[in-house]
Amino acid sequence: MAKKGKKYLDAASKVDRNEHYSVEDAISLAKETSVANFDATVEVAFRLVIDTRKNDQQIRGAVVLPHGTGKTQRVLVFAKGDKASEAEAAGADYVGESEYATKIQQGWFDFDVVVATPDMMGEVGKLGRVLGPKGLMPNPKTGTVTMDVKKAVEEIKAGKVEYRAEKAGIIHASIGKVSFSTEDLVENFNTLQDVIAKAKPASAKGTYFKSVAVTTTMGPGVKVDTSNFKL
């Protein structure tokens, strides 16, 4: 394991590893201990007590954060005709059909999110082995397979984030930048936490939020007190 630098260790020393902080205090401390020399991303990790091997306990979705993420998302839309025109008018960065499928197969990935109308999924489905491992495959659960491409593009541009529980039941997501106010980050956090709480599978019994931590790019993790989380 690589040794941590003095700057990181100094920052980490401000965090009590045995303490579980309120959401506001955790975010404030994460901002204070950011060690990056750029506007770092503020991230949250939710460890859930679920079994993702069971189909009814696979959690995936998307939510528009009230204050966005601070990141400009490049959107590629697979659509044709009027729907292509709608996507362009809504601000999509790239709109097309098979020509973009060919570019992707040739190694082009200058985009962050892919949206597709249902009739284009036959074309997009062929890219599954390429887009899937990168988490870029459109999915109805995240609103990226839809006829309402205008809404999809506008929400993504406004700060929509996707969330998905990994094998260990952990959801990683960005809730903004260090430059955001603590209040805005708290509102983003609460919005994400609320939608994950509402997604609790009926078959998941007992404790749901096993642990939660807030961190910044390259910064130390700060544990969050989950005792007041609503379910």
Swiss-Prot record:
Keywords carried by this UniProt record: Repressor, Ribonucleoprotein, Ribosomal protein, RNA-binding, rRNA-binding, Translation regulation, tRNA-binding
A biological-process GO annotation: regulation of translation
Annotated InterPro entries: Ribosom_uL1_bac-type, Ribosomal_uL1, Ribosomal_uL1-like, Ribosomal_uL1/biogenesis, Ribosomal_uL1_3-a/b-sand, Ribosomal_uL1_CS
General function of this protein: Binds directly to 23S rRNA. The L1 stalk is quite mobile in the ribosome, and is involved in E site tRNA release. Protein L1 is also a translational repressor protein, it controls the translation of the L11 operon by binding to its mRNA.
Family: Belongs to the universal ribosomal protein uL1 family.
Subunit organization: Part of the 50S ribosomal subunit.
Annotated protein name in UniProt: Large ribosomal subunit protein uL1
Organism in which the protein naturally occurs: Staphylococcus carnosus (strain TM300)
Organism phylogeny: Bacteria, Bacillati, Bacillota, Bacilli, Bacillales
